A protein has these predicted regions:
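Membrane-spanning beta-strands of outer-membrane beta-barrel proteins
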Residues: 56-58, 113, 154-155, 194, ...
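Beta-barrel outer-membrane channel/assembly domains of diderm bacteria
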Residues: 2-4, 12, 18-136, 159-165, ...
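Short secondary-structure boundary segments
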Residues: 174, 289, 384
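Surface-exposed coil loops of outer-membrane beta-barrel proteins
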Residues: 88-117, 126-225, 230, 234, ...
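Short acidic, gly/pro-rich beta-turn/loop elements at beta-sheet edges
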Residues: 48, 73-75, 86-88, 141, ...
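Outer-membrane beta-barrel proteins
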Residues: 45-54, 144-151, 257-268
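Detector for outer-membrane/organellar transmembrane beta-barrel domains
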Residues: 207, 234-354
Length: 407
């Protein structure tokens, strides 16, 4: 791989990170506290493809505070990303910015400064109401998420209500803005406007959780209108202990998506997902299947999701191909116990096979591997992805090494 001397330099930088002591809220009076927000993440990302490569070393910082009085709180948080090594293309689309560098591979972590969150929140008994620019992660983030993997977080200008009534949970959001990961230099793709409604209702019954959801997304921007859709579905999860130190985990989802609002196309496509895992002490083995369907030449899309979490870390399927996508995957993960020099040590490996949902095209396959541990208050993570193309995309290798801290 062509990660050259930068990998060595990054390892040296991550081996001696700046330490930060854990912070507690500052009590101003009996009723008033101020909780500071200080976060940092230094990351190297390398991309190796047949025609282009990339080397990116970026530093993301967040600073802010949450002021609480009784049931009311106000939170403000700024976020900035600095490109220390800029041999990468920050935008996978045309943009009037010198951060658009098509001679390099894409690493969508542009240099950026913005107001990440500013919100007013009220808590009353078992209910919470939040107004303003906020982080929203719904369920497994397949439909709506904050894209926490990227340096610039995705947030929403919205009003949200949450309630818990015995075993029942209710969650409703109305948003008018989707603040993307691309930042201030991305032109109209910095933020998408529209009318977005999210509703999730769940019930817990023994070891099982059942949720129903509805996502109605209507974009104002004409160039993005094809992503307007309505999605209705169900998701069930269960964690079942059996024998000594053994646990069975199950998850399944079904949804139906169709055109909505400003979308000029007519389609209706299904979503299916199923996963099973068996855990014994620190070891977990899992296998799963996910299908994003297609109809009338239009595939099911999830433009608000935390997409890096799904369908391989090489990010080859951020946009679902027109013929849909099937992902067959299996993996192993292990959490090491009692390693004093590397507390929290964990490792994982996953294999994916990708096919079309319509027809019999074989897109390719992918291996993912990761390892992480703690150095005092600093978390260290290494990740690797290798995609081998058959009929979709190109052979791609990616490597990440990062250190992060939260005060």
């Amino acid at each position: 791989m062509k990660f050259r001397h930068l990998l060595g330099a990054t390892v040296i930088g991550l081996a001696a990170p700046a330490y930060a002591a854990p912070g507690d809220p500052v009590r101003v009076s009996d009723d008033l506290t101020i909780d500071p927000i200080v976060e940092g993440r230094l990351r190297y990302e390398g991309v190796d493809q047949p025609a282009v490569d990339a080397d990116a070393l970026t530093l993301r910082l967040r600073a802010g505070a949450e002021i609480k009085m009784h049931s009311l709180s106000i939170l403000a948080e700024a976020e900035g990303t600095l490109g220390l090594v800029n041999r990468y293309n920050a935008f996978p689309f045309a943009a009037a910015s010198d951060q658009r560098r098509p001679q390099y591979g894409t690493v969508p972590d542009p240099m950026n400064v913005d107001l990440n969150r500013i919100q007013l929140q009220y808590r009353f008994r078992h209910s919470t109401f939040t107004l303003g620019r906020q982080r929203i992660n719904l369920d497994d983030q397949r439909w709506v998420g904050s894209v926490a993997w990227r340096q610039n977080e995705q947030t929403f200008d919205a009003v949200r209500g949450e309630a818990k009534i015995g075993p029942v949970t209710l969650d409703g959001t109305y948003a008018i803005g989707q603040r993307t990961i691309f930042g201030i230099d991305a032109g109209p793709r910095q933020s998408y406007q529209g009318a977005f409604f999210f509703a999730v209702a769940g019930v817990k019954a023994g070891p099982a959780n059942l949720k129903g959801f509805a996502y109605l997304i209507d974009y104002d921007e004409g160039f993005f209108a094809a992503n307007s859709s309505k999605t209705f579905g169900l998701r069930a999860t269960a964690a079942i202990p059996f024998a000594a130190a053994w646990k069975l985990s199950l998850a399944g989802s079904y949804a139906r998506q169709s055109d909505y609002g400003s979308n000029p196309f007519d389609y209706a496509a299904d979503y299916i997902a199923a996963e099973a895992g068996v855990g014994f002490k620190g070891l977990t083995a899992s296998a799963g299947y996910e299908r994003l369907g297609s109809n009338n030449g239009r595939a099911l899309q999830t433009p608000m999701a935390t997409l890096h979490k799904f369908n391989g870390w090489a990010d080859m399927f951020l946009t679902t191909p027109a013929a849909g996508l099937q992902d067959y995957y299996g993996g192993l993960a292990y959490k090491f116990d009692g390693v004093k020099l590397l507390p929290g040590l964990n490792a994982a490996v996953t294999y994916h096979r990708f096919d079309s949902a319509i027809g019999d095209a074989s897109y390719g396959n992918e291996w993912n591997a990761s390892a992480g541990f703690k150095l005092g208050p600093v978390g260290v993570l290494a990740k690797y992805a290798r995609y081998e193309a058959s009929s979709f995309g190109v052979d791609t290798q990616k490597f990440w090494l990062e250190a992060n801290f939260t005060y």
